[in-house]
């Protein structure tokens, strides 16, 4: 099928939609529910911008992310469930985890980092994995400061990583030396080709010669999208549209116009 194809990697999922998409899925499949994204609703716990750092370090200490604002970074990245279809993209602002680690006097052999939420939830990750991906302690999502019922709140985000590791309401970070570096869960192969029709209508009629625009977003967590393919005859033939230059850390936002 002939047509015009366009793509970029721009755009974000509005915060209310992020909660609607992940609010229930995250409970069972990803990290804890992101209640702090919902305007007017409170999250559980007593999280603030103060985070306690401990583990296998010479001296425990606390940091206030507000005092590290000059080191903050802004990134746009995908948040994607490992065992479900939901995913979204957000513009986040936060302090690099590396900046906090640099402040710690590590003991020999430290290879693991675990961020704990106010409810005690935490997922161990290889320290080098997080540093290589420029993990952020995020305090702003899509221009909105994160809040808990007691004040400011922080979340752990990192590119090309499933959302179960995006711990909410972070209050403690442990840097530890483990005998075995923890494995990192990747996306379930069943969900690599995530397809969801977000908008549809019954009884639509398109007349010959009318211009029709199809649009959507695509993500293959940890791998760049190489092409979007279309079929208008039940899969007998396919039109391949390359997405040259697309990177793995963001979704592909595409449009295909035909008549």
Residue locations for each model-derived region?
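N-terminal intrinsically disordered, low-complexity segments enriched in P/E/S/T
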Residues: 1-232, 236-259
